Structure formats: structure tokens, C-alpha cells
Amino acid sequence: MTTKIVNIVVAGGNYAGLNAMRHLYATLLASPVQANKTVVNITLVDRRDGFVHYIGMTRGITEPSFGSSLWVPYSTVDWLQHSQITIKQGTVADIQPTLVQLTNGEQLQFDYLVVALGISRFAPIGIRSSTKLEFVAELAESYAQLESAKSVVVVGGGAVGIELAADIKCDFPHKSVTLVHSRALPLPGPFKDELRHNVVDILQNSIGVELVLGQRVIAQEPASADMADTLTDMPEHVLSTATDATLTLSGGQTLHGDWVVRCLGTRDKKSIINLPSSTQEPIFGANGIRVKDTMQIDDVAYPHIYACGDICSRDTVKLAGVAMYGAYIAAINIARTISSVSNDSPTLEESPLYPSKILLLMSKDHFIMQLGDEIWEKEKTRQYVSDDMGLQGSINGLSLNKVPAAYSPFDLAPAF
């Protein structure tokens, strides 16, 4: 029997991409496909040389010693050194039906693709670095500006802006910290106003952050780089900070900040997804790549392409845990298809729709959570809170410190 070679590309690392890699390894490499004489090669494409625990970035800026632990180099992960795994450090420029092209011109042909490229933010919340050494240096740069500032203004009252303002004020209680948000209450999204009012109370009365709500920043002098370069494909390389800046608000008020950081939303990766739709519906919708419950792209032309994590349309609120579960579904469905010894298509797993959820970590002592329509009590929420902002849990969950156990893709995983 002729040996069949199957090439899988996972575009993007972190929570979704690495969990896809973990389950592809456990189902296809740790227990090699024997019955149909298949050799599987898996390529991970990531512009960084390691995993970054993005959830901890706000505290990584205020506590650089903690921040340096957020980056786990791929070279330290034993199972990623498998002979049938290739780690390609590079940036994806274009995704077509059978190939991924990198910005250096290299093309990677695939039989199966997992798109896990996430979404982008401007630096320093978005990560400019491609190596841990660069990451540590950039954290130190942000920390130096923060440490020398007497007054800090955070613009944008989404989850990241809220957590950053809280971490700064708690780690530097003598600094003036102001959070500016354009709406009457912070935290956009499908959440209750009761939750938003609780957030306001915690920030103002428990932590001491000054809030300016219902006003937009209409001018900033000097402007930060992101204000002039909002159309870039790589916002992570553009700083959203300014020093010694004056902000003019829509209500006529002016604010001064020795250090100003703008946390104003995300940018998608629509420009690199060049997959013609076979219907009138675009492949990339308003909330990301349209996917089925199986995590396959929702188009009959692309049963071999999966998308998971923040880049897909699956969930309104983008969460690391949901990204990991979607990646698990994608990986086992690919493994089932490859491992099937009959000509019949195997039954594919489907991902359930999860209720919206948010857990806000407002420094080490203050946190709040809404799951679906329920706002959880603090003591009930505490079980999901750790001093390291979930770092060790993510390392364990992604098997970055151990080799994943082999299992059959036709069985449920020991843990997703």
C-alpha cells in the first residue's frame, strides 16, 4: 500500500492554535495513524517564537517581573520538537483554498488548515515582540514610562481599559489614574447595566480610579502613533501611548496625562482571508470567519478549512476558554477524517454555543463575573481567580509543561 502524506497547517498560535496543535499531536502523532498508511506533517505558523498569556498583559505592564513569565518559548515545549512538527516563525500574508502565503513570500501547501490568527490590538497591549527577549525589553520600556508618570490617562472603558486602569492604580496607589469612556457606562457588550454599575463602584470607591464617562477624546497633543496609522494590517507594531499629553474631550474639558494609553478596540484579519464564497454570504462576516458547529468554514467549498478562536464568528464575546474548545473540536474532526479507514465520512463533533461570559480582574483583590444573565457573587467567582491571572492554568491546559497523552480521535479527549 502506498504511503499517503497529509499536510496540516495551523495558522496562529496561542490559546486556539496551540490547543489545536496539542490535540493533533495527541490523536495523530503520539499514536501514529497506522491503518491507512498515512504520514501526517503538521506546521505551526506564528510570528512569535512562543506562547503569550495575553490575559495577563495589563499586569505584565505594571509588574514586569510577572510580565516576563507570560512568554513561554516553543523551544522549551518537548512535544513541539516532534520530527513531524515544523514551527515556522513568520507572518501570514494571504490564505487561499490550498495554500498559506507568508510575508516573506514562502508558500505552505496544505490538505487541512486551522485558522487561529486571532484579532489585533495596538501596542503595548497588542504584542509587538517576536521573541521573549524583545518582549521583556518592551515591557521594561512601558514600565519605565509608567513609573515616571505622576498622572495616567487610560482611554477606552472596555475590559482591557478597565483592567489596565485598575492594575495601575493598585500597583501605584499614589498616582492619579483616570479612565475615559465615550459611553455613559463602561464595558460594551451583551452585559447587564447592573454589572456596569458594579464596575463603576469598584473602580471609583474601592480602587480610586477617576472616571470620565460619556465623553469622547476629540483631540490629543501630542498624538500617539495609532491615531495616525489606524489602517495598518499589523497594529501590534504601532504604539498607542503618549507622554506628557493633553486631551480635549467632547464636552470641552481638557485632561493632562504624563502617560496616556489608548485601549480602543481591536482590528480583524479580514484582509488576508482570500477565500471566494460559493454563496452571496461573505466568508468573513461582521464578527469574523463564518463557521459551522464543527468549526469548519460555513461554505461547501472549504470542508478542509477550520477556524477557531477570536477570528471566527462563533461567539460575540471572545474568550480564551472558548477558543481552546473550538480548537479541540477542529483538531479531532481533522484527525477523525484522516484516521477513518472507510470511504464513509466520519461523524464530526460539534461545539455547543456557550452563554456570554466575562470575568473582570480589577487588580488582585477586586473581580466580578457575569455568566449568561447571572451576575455572580464575589465568593462564587473566587474559584476562577488566581494571583497569576490564569497563567499556570493555561500552561497546564495547553500541555506546555508536559507531553499530551495519546488518545483516539473517535473518543472524547481526557480534557479539551
Annotated model-derived regions:
Residues 1-7, 25-39, 80-83, 223-241, ...:
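Eukaryotic N-terminal targeting leaders
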Residues 2-86, 166-191:
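Beta1-alpha1 glycine-rich phosphate/pyrophosphate-binding loop at the start
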Residues 3-11, 35, 39, 44, ...:
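FAD-binding core/adjacent interface of flavoenzyme oxidoreductases
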Residues 3-6, 47-65, 113, 124-161, ...:
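Conserved N-terminal glycine/acidic-rich loop preference
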Residues 13, 317-322, 326-416:
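C-terminal, flexible cofactor-proximal segment of oxidoreductases
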Residues 41, 83-90, 94-95, 174-293, ...:
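A Rossmann-like FAD-binding core segment of flavoenzymes
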Residues 132-150, 254-325:
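FAD-site-proximal beta/loop scaffold in flavoenzymes
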Residues 151-155, 159-203, 209-212, 321-349:
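Rossmann-like dinucleotide-binding core of oxidoreductases
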